[in-house]
Curated annotation (Swiss-Prot):
Intrachain S-S bonds: none
Ranges annotated as biased composition (Low complexity): 89-133, 149-158, 170-181, 207-227, 491-553, 635-820, 867-891
Biased composition (Polar residues): 554-576, 605-622
Species lineage: Eukaryota, Amoebozoa, Evosea, Eumycetozoa, Dictyostelia
Compositional bias ranges of the Basic residues kind: 196-206, 228-269, 314-358
Biased segments, Acidic residues type: 75-88
Protein name per the record: Uncharacterized protein DDB_G0287625
Length: 981
């Protein structure tokens, strides 16, 4: 899984995160800041994800896998039906049902995650995702994927932004295009009505006064339908009027009386018109005002005449105002429509601002000059008064008609006429609504109090569930955490299985084993106790380790993680000898034991501490108690079980089952490799094949689209398991009572005999004393056969089901064969591989070989783990983590809790922080003195806090701005990232 966190310079663009998803997911709600890891997902609604911590993220990846997804469904429920998991884990359904029985939905999800990760690690992401590809694209209404489904958020946004930009743009433009579009029809109707009305009035009045040409031109101009036409005409008439005015200006006083009277008549008309135009807001002037103006303007006649052509008035302000006023007043043919239109469009921007130029000196000069030359000054005043009154009536009629017809003027009701108040209210409401919508869309941050979660562009919370093994969508709700660290954000799994069920989440992985366990309910009941526990143990061992490595980290992540650009899940999963598998095995051990320790003490402590986050996670106190007990048992088993410590089983079959990618099943796949060639198939299709595990040994290969088995010769129980899986299936069928399929028995051997596999576990576990251990499953050639079938030493690992009782022996065999490590050989064999690969790491060039040593010991040594330097490196001191249950003295176990989005989903999005729920990140005490700052170190997906900023972390692709690259040859097998200052 790769994150390319690149900050973009712009404020609006989010940081892009390139993600590959390798885990199946049950229910997914994408909150802002959530990301789908294994899908090529683009999450482009920048308003929505603009705050993760404090940074913008856009989740962007390429299109390659999107076609394989059926899709995400919108759902308001945080917990979707298990049927969905069963649906997309159809291969996994049988065993997932068992997982559902044994473990919670998280188990299903984890089974899905495990099986699907396993699927993902091989071909099955493509296969199983292709089964599910349509729904994601379908649900992409809310989430836009890069490829085919990039419609959703972007489209909703685009729709919104288009409509918004329409409304905003119309508000901004000085042109009246928008309002003309909106009111064209109504205005035409209004004009038709007001045309006849005003025409009759104007004729009756103006004909009597001898201005028939004026009223005719006015009524003619009123019939102009669109403002754009009147605007273009006003341009023409403006030029004509300016020419005519300049001509009239240039005429000397000695011109004939006729020419002066002509220009005077034009000017007098323009004077009254411009004055009424300036009063188009409905402010009529009294007669005394007009007299005052006329007196005031006659005084300046000679001066204004002399200055009119002068260049003192050539400044843009006066020129523009003069031209504007002339264009209204001069050409009488269209002056009315033009004055009305222009004044309205200007009034939009405040109306009053253009009033003074409208009554500028030019008009006053013209009026004064005309009055002085006019013989009948009173007649002119009366004419102007009548025109003003007529214009006011027209304004009132127009406004009344517009309001009656629903015309919405964009000037926010600045009229004083009748209906102005109503229109003002309507405009105010419309504008408020527009602003509300705009603000709502802008404020879709998860931190916005309004939204409290991911909102679609329509303001609805997006809740999506992937109905397919699209893998690790780090969903905060019902997704099972592979490893608490791997799926750090998948704390919802913790909800179901409780944080201890992070082991149970790992158990959900081992719920695949639990499927085996359920299948081997005899074995798996022991193992479901131990498999819920030993699934916690083995899940921690198998699932957390194997899931982390085999499922997500082991194979899928290695395939998807940046450094292994060449490695595809098929390549990695099939290459049993690849160092990645060994690495994955070792890391699986580390992760298993971290999960053990976390779930063991930290969950109890955190739950006992009354942590609300844990309470929100835990579906119920019963689940908490059960999970607590399971995890205690599991942790005890896991501590006692070298399987937890046996990367041999895990890693042996991680080698085998890394191919199976059911490292979860790998431990069980040790036995599950016995059967997880069958049960890896079963674990691949442990969900399926656990029911069919006998068949799944063969059918797992067949049933697993993963065909990890097919890819794994081990995973190909068809190869070995088909041979012995036939035996296994036979033996499974022989042992099917314990394991519904003795491959389940193997899984039971792996699971119950996870207790038997936990013969590392079960060597120490009384489960080894379980009849499961005593079961013919253990004794079954199935267990022995898959042991024989899977690897010779994986057979021994499978025999480690039986021989995992001698897992040290078989694991030695497996260590010899699988490069997995027994407790005896942990210090020797397990470290050499990683030591060869990555001798030094980090700023201090520390030998990280102790990592594998210490983590291999973690399962057995309960209190020594805190003193291990791993705890110092792997734990983080950054403030976003809350350490609970211990001091940093190096001796007390410390849970570093990370806040994730889980309780947002649990609360239905009522909390506005994305990462509200704490999650077990690391159970270690920090020795911060060793580092300047250990920013954050995780196993697998999750958030990394850098500079108090939460950023997604699966496996970092380091660039100049990010932490130093991991010196190990291939960084991909481990999700553990050391981030130094």
């Amino acid at each position: 899984m790769e994150f390319h966190l690149q900050k973009k310079a712009t404020k609006t663009n989010a940081t892009t995160i390139s993600i590959e998803i390798t885990k199946p997911v049950k229910n997914i709600k994408l909150e802002p800041g959530q990301f789908i890891e294994d899908i090529k997902l683009i999450y482009t609604h920048t308003n929505t994800i603009r705050k993760i911590g404090t940074t913008n993220y856009t989740i962007v990846t390429d299109n390659s896998n999107i076609d394989n997804f059926k899709g995400i469904e919108n759902s308001s429920d945080d917990d979707d039906d298990d049927d969905d998991d069963d649906d997309y884990n159809n291969n996994n359904n049988n065993n997932n049902n068992n997982n559902n029985n044994n473990n919670n939905n998280n188990n299903n999800n984890n089974n899905n995650i495990n099986s699907n990760k396993n699927i993902n690690s091989n071909n099955s992401i493509n296969n199983s995702l292709s089964n599910n590809s349509s729904n994601i694209n379908n649900s992409s209404n809310n989430i836009s994927y890069i490829g085919n489904s990039s419609n959703s958020i972007n489209n909703n946004d685009n729709k919104l932004s288009r409509s918004r930009s329409r409304s905003r743009g119309s508000a901004k433009t000085t042109s009246s295009l928008t309002s003309s579009k909106r009111s064209l029809d109504s205005r035409n109707r209004n004009r038709d009505r007001s045309y006849t009305r005003s025409r009759s009035r104007s004729r009756s009045r103006s004909y009597s006064r001898g201005f028939s040409s004026l009223s005719r031109s006015r009524s003619r101009s009123r019939s102009i339908s669109s403002r754009s036409r009147s605007r273009s005409r006003s341009r023409r008439s403006r030029s004509r009027s300016s020419r005519s005015r300049s001509r009239s200006r240039s005429k000397s006083k000695s011109k004939s009386r006729r020419s002066r009277s002509r220009s005077r008549s034009r000017r007098s008309r323009s004077r009254s018109d411009s004055r009424s135009r300036s009063d188009s807001r409905g402010r009529s002037r009294s007669r005394s005002d007009s007299r005052k103006n006329s007196k005031r303007q006659t005084k300046s006649r000679s001066r204004s005449e002399s200055r009119l052509p002068d260049k003192n008035y050539s400044s843009k302000r006066h020129q523009n105002s003069r031209k504007r006023n002339r264009s209204y007043s001069r050409s009488r043919t269209r002056s009315w429509s033009r004055s009305r239109t222009r004044s309205r469009s200007r009034r939009r921007y405040g109306g009053r601002t253009f009033r003074s130029p409208r009554r500028s000196r030019d008009d006053s000069r013209d009026r004064g000059r005309d009055r002085e030359r006019d013989r009948d000054r009173n007649r002119c005043r009366d004419r102007d008064r009548d025109r003003e009154r007529e214009r006011e009536r027209r304004l009132r009629d127009r406004n009344r008609d517009r309001e009656r017809d629903g015309y919405r003027e964009r000037d926010r009701g600045r009229y004083r006429e009748r209906g102005g108040e109503r229109e003002r209210n309507r405009n105010r409401d419309r504008d408020r609504e527009r602003d509300r919508n705009r603000d709502r869309d802008r404020s879709q941050s998860p931190h916005n109090e309004k939204n409290k979660g991911f909102l679609s562009s329509s303001g609805n919370k997006i809740e999506t569930k992937l109905k397919s093994p699209i893998s690790n969508i780090t969903k905060y709700s019902d997704m099972d955490i592979d490893n608490n660290i791997n799926n750090i954000i998948n704390s919802n799994n913790i909800n179901n299985n409780n944080i201890k069920n992070s082991n149970n989440i790992n158990n959900s992985n081992n719920n695949n084993n639990n499927n085996n366990n359920n299948n081997n309910n005899n074995n798996n009941n022991n193992n479901n106790n131990n498999n819920n526990n030993n699934n916690n143990n083995n899940n921690n061992n198998n699932n957390s380790h194997n899931n982390t490595n085999g499922n997500v980290n082991g194979v899928s992540k290695t395939t998807s993680s940046p450094a292994s650009d060449n490695s595809t899940p098929e390549n990695i999963s099939t290459d049993l000898d690849s160092p990645l598998l060994k690495k994955n095995q070792q890391l699986n051990l580390i992760k298993e034991q971290t999960n053990k320790l976390k779930t063991e003490d930290s969950i109890d402590e955190s739950n006992n501490n009354g942590n609300d986050r844990f309470k929100t996670k835990c579906s119920s106190t019963e689940n908490e108690n059960k999970n607590r007990e399971n995890e205690k048992n599991n942790s005890e088993n896991s501590k006692n079980n070298p399987n937890n410590n046996n990367p041999n089983n895990n890693n042996n079959n991680n080698n085998n089952n890394n191919n199976n990618n059911n490292n979860n099943n790998n431990n069980n796949n040790n036995n599950n490799n016995n059967n997880n060639n069958n049960n890896n198939n079963n674990n691949n299709n442990n969900n399926n094949n656990n029911n069919n595990n006998n068949n799944n040994n063969n059918s797992n290969n067949n049933n697993n689209p993963n065909n990890y088995n097919n890819n794994n010769p081990n995973n190909n129980p068809n190869n070995n398991n088909n041979n012995n899986n036939k035996n296994i299936n036979k033996n499974n069928s022989n042992n099917s009572n314990n394991s519904n399929n003795s491959s389940n028995s193997r899984n039971n051997s792996n699971n119950s005999n996870n207790n038997n596999n936990n013969n590392n576990l079960n060597n120490n576990n009384p489960n080894n004393n379980n009849p499961n251990n005593n079961n013919p499953n253990n004794n079954n050639p199935n267990n022995n056969n898959p042991n024989n079938n899977n690897n010779n030493n994986n057979n021994n690992n499978n025999n480690n089901n039986n021989n995992n009782n001698n897992n040290n022996n078989n694991n030695k065999n497996n260590n010899n064969n699988n490069n997995s490590f027994s407790e005896e050989e942990e210090e020797e064999g397990s470290l050499n591989q990683v030591r060869n690969i990555s001798p030094k790491i980090g700023k201090y060039n520390e030998d990280i070989s102790f990592l594998e040593k210490e983590w291999n010991r973690l399962g057995n040594v309960q209190n020594d783990t805190n003193s291990s330097p791993i705890s110092q490196q792997l734990s983080t001191s950054s403030s976003p983590f809350k350490s609970t249950g211990g001091s940093n003295d190096g001796n007390s176990s410390d849970i570093i809790m990370m806040e994730s989005n889980n309780d947002i989903i649990n609360d239905g999005g009522k909390k506005n922080r994305v990462f509200k729920e704490s999650q077990v990140v690391q159970r270690e005490s920090l020795d911060v003195s060793k580092f300047k700052k250990s920013k954050a170190i995780f196993f697998g997906e999750g958030w990394i806090y850098r500079n108090h900023r939460k950023e997604p972390c699966v496996s970092w692709r380091f660039n100049n701005n990010t932490p130093p690259p991991d010196p190990r040859l291939n960084r991909d097998y481990i999700n553990l990232r050391y981030v130094y200052e």
